[in-house]
């Protein structure tokens, strides 16, 4: 993938860029793997906003991705196409298995049309193959990693993501995550070899607010710019600083909100470099 820059023909295009989509081999998705994806505008069943800054955007259909890859062990598959997926930053690969079934997977870097891949404990160590962690050599770069055996991939799924298998210790495998955290994961969990493709995606300059609206992202408004009815920092004559310590729209103090002493904390060998202090 490469980044194509626009000429500054308008203020919105000045400095903006777009992916060149050179790796895409088909523009229409596989119909049998499409599902409806209705929009909710960040609202729950009561109509209340539960996730802010969501709304509008282009209509999408969900592509069913095989995150488990545990029911086709030993069955060879051919990469039929590399496709665009509007629901994620990574590209997806359409696999044609020799038994006639079709599946989508996250497309790893350097995977191309016509490649042969497979799953299972005896699979080769090459990009796109899926194996249990206990069967992967130490030092291998992996992605699409399960947290529970058979639970489906949860980590390392976005564009350019890569996790390194640094050690194996009894029933656990130690992984170094992109954040710098080192974490134990059950060695029976599966992972895919290689790093996720489309790594240049993070370098795209969207150029104007309208392109984010096409993606379904609404503006983020500062609390001090609101009215008192809308935010604890709202109101005041002229420009004010809010008059209190930073809080959320619901009065929660600024800072980390994750509960400490979670059961999964014992699996963390070394924490990532924290940007904000715990409160």
Curated annotation (Swiss-Prot):
A GO term, aspect molecular function? rRNA binding
Q: Does the keyword rRNA-binding apply?
A: yes
**Biased amino acid composition, Basic residues:** 269-279
Coiled-coil features, chain-numbered ranges:
none
Which cellular component, as a GO term, is one annotated location?
large ribosomal subunit
Please note every region of biased composition (Basic and acidic residues): 253-268
Region (Disordered) location: 32-53, 225-279
SMART domains named in the record:
Ribosomal_L2, Ribosomal_L2_C
User: Superkingdom of this entry's organism?
Assistant: Bacteria
Give the keywords, sorted.
Ribonucleoprotein, Ribosomal protein, RNA-binding, rRNA-binding
**According to the UniProt entry, where is the signal peptide?**
none
InterPro entries assigned to the protein according to its UniProt record, in alphabetical order:
NA-bd_OB-fold, Rib_uL2_dom2, Ribosomal_uL2, Ribosomal_uL2_bac/org-type, Ribosomal_uL2_C, Ribosomal_uL2_CS, Ribosomal_uL2_dom3, Ribosomal_uL2_RNA-bd_dom
Q: Which GO terms describe its biological process?
A: cytoplasmic translation
Supply the Gene3D superfamilies for this chain.
2.30.30.30, Nucleic acid-binding proteins (2.40.50.140), Ribosomal protein L2, domain 3 (4.10.950.10)
HAMAP family in the record: Ribosomal_uL2_B
**Quaternary structure and interacting proteins, as annotated:** Part of the 50S ribosomal subunit. Forms a bridge to the 30S subunit in the 70S ribosome.
Q: Which family does it belong to?
A: Belongs to the universal ribosomal protein uL2 family.
Task: Relate the protein's function as given in its record.
Answer: One of the primary rRNA binding proteins. Required for association of the 30S and 50S subunits to form the 70S ribosome, for tRNA binding and peptide bond formation. It has been suggested to have peptidyltransferase activity; this is somewhat controversial. Makes several contacts with the 16S rRNA in the 70S ribosome.
What protein am I looking at? Large ribosomal subunit protein uL2
Identify the species of origin: Clavibacter sepedonicus (Clavibacter michiganensis subsp. sepedonicus)
């Amino acid at each position: 993938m490469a980044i194509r820059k626009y000429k500054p023909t308008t203020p919105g295009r000045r400095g903006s860029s777009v992916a060149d989509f050179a790796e895409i081999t088909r523009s229409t998705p596989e119909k049998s793997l499409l599902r409806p994806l209705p929009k909710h505008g960040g609202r729950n069943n009561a109509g209340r906003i539960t996730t802010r800054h969501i709304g509008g955007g282009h209509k999408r259909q969900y592509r069913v991705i095989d995150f488990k890859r545990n029911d086709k062990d030993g069955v060879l598959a051919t990469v039929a196409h590399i496709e665009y997926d509007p629901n994620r930053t990574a590209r997806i690969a359409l696999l044609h298995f020799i038994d006639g079934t079709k599946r989508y997977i996250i497309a790893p870097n350097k995977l191309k049309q016509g490649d042969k891949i497979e799953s299972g404990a005896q699979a080769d160590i090459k990009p796109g193959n899926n194996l249990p962690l206990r069967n992967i050599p130490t030092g291998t770069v992996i992605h699409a990693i399960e947290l529970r055996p058979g639970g489906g991939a949860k980590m390392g799924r976005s564009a350019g993501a890569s996790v390194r298998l640094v050690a194996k210790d009894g029933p656990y495998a130690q992984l170094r995550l992109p954040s710098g955290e080192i974490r134990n994961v059950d060695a029976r969990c599966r992972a895919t070899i290689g790093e996720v493709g489309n790594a240049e995606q993070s370098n795209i300059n969207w150029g104007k607010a309208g392109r984010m609206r096409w993606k379904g992202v609404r503006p983020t408004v500062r609390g001090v710019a609101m009215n008192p009815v809308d935010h604890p920092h709202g109101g005041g004559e002229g420009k004010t600083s809010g008059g209190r310590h930073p809080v959320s729209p619901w009065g929660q103090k600024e800072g980390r909100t994750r509960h400490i002493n979670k059961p999964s904390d014992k699996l963390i060998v070394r924490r990532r470099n924290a940007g904000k202090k715990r409160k």
